[in-house]
Amino acid sequence: MQQRRPIRRALLSVSDKAGIVEFAQALSHRGVELLSTGGTARLLADAGLAVTEVSDYTGFPEMMDGRVKTLHPKVHGGILGRRDQDDAIMTQHDIKPIDIVVVNLYPFAQTVARENCTLEDAVENIDIGGPTMVRSAAKNHKDVAIVVKSSDYTTIINEIDANEGSLTYETRFDLAIKAFEHTAAYDSMIANYFGALVPPYHGDTDKPSGHFPRTLNLNYIKKQDMRYGENSHQQAAFYIEENIHEASVATSTQLQGKALSYNNIADTDAALECVKEFAEPACVIVKHANPCGVAIGGSILDAYDRAYKTDPTSAFGGIIAFNRELDEETAQAIISRQFVEVIIAPSASDAALKVTAAKQNVRVLTSGSWQQRVPALDFKRVNGGLLVQDRDLGMVDTSQLRVVTERQPSEQELRDALFCWKVAKFVKSNAIVYARDNMTIGIGAGQMSRVYSAKIAGIKAADEGLEVKGSAMASDAFFPFRDGIDAAAAVGISCVIQPGGSIRDDEVIAAANEHGIAMIFTDMRHFRH
């Protein structure tokens, strides 16, 4: 099975023509005969290459507006023919062996992503001949190489040169795996698109759910294996989407430090997604997927100083995210002040990297800049199933807020309320966030009762000597009882922001009025589990 196969004849038919002329030139210069179709053949001919149209080779014209081009025995016989046992029948029918197939498929994903895409547009961008050739070549990888990625062009030419015009079995097998992955992803996209057009019904209503396909097909690419998972007895790997349109931990570049662990990646994602909510220079410090300090400042150093003050104990061994370039002064403050697992920012200055280099184990990542948040799906696995929902991109502005108490919030209270509301979205439920002057001063996370999250936020603030009086409090969901408001009043909270929607809203509002607290309803919940 280690046999090399000489490359004498190539079939090229691509939708994405990036690099194809140069690749075809390299093959031709090495004596490889070129077969091609339609637009690819014209492009190669215009580049001065000797190329045979598939229709001339088969003696059968392209037809039906190009729907039928390569679906012919002389094409697939040349691809599927087994060199050690089908030679006679191939000779009998004048079928020439094809040694390498270079194909990429109609741009279905790009087509259906367009706002004005019609069903007819989608249908016409379903490739038939391409996947058929890809699968044929991948099946017969013992004799044929299949290329579906332009990123492999240079590697293939280099190996042909290194192996006297041949490709090894190991390379052909690896290319076949990529090919099957490619067609699986392509068919999944089509199935997901069409499945979402069928009106499935749910529960006891007759309203079609739409939006989600009947069968969900997911394709992710392995970026790296992990030493272990959440715990040392669990194996793990990190998979990413093939086409990511937003700066994220998945697209980040690691500039220094040890390999990222499973928990590092999860926590870094939590920190980065939180810091993206802020337009001003901001810092988010995360521990165990929960923010333990968040602040806005005049600079990222100022923001870091303020975020760190929220909870220095929890910040130890944490993840730090910024929404501005990491500079030398901020890097020095972090390295001299605390043990940190990961620092992530859109970019990092050379001077900052010289500082962090003194701590070689510290992982420094750059995410690139972000312009907007991209709608996507969130997944949560349960035993035997998968919960799927839209990504929570909801956020309110001042025009959407409802003040429900007798007292109106001051301008400062309103700013603090909106700040801690943004933070609460990223704290595990039940989530309570205390904030003042664009800085968290206490965070209560993940408690089974909301009132205890409120109490913990107060305890955290007291432990660090942070003044709560006159601060704002955010709750990710409504208060089911007045006790959360009473607990907030006891430590000096003057403004509360929450979704509202409890059957006891009147009691909760009355409690706020009793304590002279301004209360704002957002009419939007941010559970996080």
Curated annotation (Swiss-Prot):
Q: In which pathway does it act?
A: Purine metabolism; IMP biosynthesis via de novo pathway; 5-formamido-1-(5-phospho-D-ribosyl)imidazole-4-carboxamide from 5-amino-1-(5-phospho-D-ribosyl)imidazole-4-carboxamide (10-formyl THF route): step 1/1; Purine metabolism; IMP biosynthesis via de novo pathway; IMP from 5-formamido-1-(5-phospho-D-ribosyl)imidazole-4-carboxamide: step 1/1
Name of protein: Bifunctional purine biosynthesis protein PurH
- What is this enzyme's catalytic activity, as reactions? (6R)-10-formyltetrahydrofolate + 5-amino-1-(5-phospho-beta-D-ribosyl)imidazole-4-carboxamide = 5-formamido-1-(5-phospho-D-ribosyl)imidazole-4-carboxamide + (6S)-5,6,7,8-tetrahydrofolate; IMP + H2O = 5-formamido-1-(5-phospho-D-ribosyl)imidazole-4-carboxamide
- Gene3D superfamilies hit by this protein: 3.40.140.20, Methylglyoxal synthase-like domain
The record's note on its domains: The IMP cyclohydrolase activity resides in the N-terminal region.
Arranged from A to Z, the UniProt key words for this protein are:
Hydrolase, Multifunctional enzyme, Purine biosynthesis, Transferase
Which segments constitute the MGS-like domain? 1-148
Q: Does the keyword Hydrolase apply?
A: yes
Recorded hits in SMART domains, A to Z, give:
AICARFT_IMPCHas, MGS
Q: Which organism is it from?
A: Pectobacterium atrosepticum (strain SCRI 1043 / ATCC BAA-672) (Erwinia carotovora subsp. atroseptica)
- What Enzyme Commission number(s) does the record list for this chain? 2.1.2.3, 3.5.4.10
Q: Which HAMAP family match?
A: PurH
List cellular component terms (GO): cytosol
What Pfam families does the entry give?
A: AICARFT_IMPCHas, MGS
Q: Which residues form a coiled coil?
A: none
Please name the GO terms of the biological process aspect recorded for this protein, alphabetically: 'de novo' IMP biosynthetic process
What family is this? Belongs to the PurH family.
Annotated GO molecular function terms are: IMP cyclohydrolase activity; phosphoribosylaminoimidazolecarboxamide formyltransferase activity
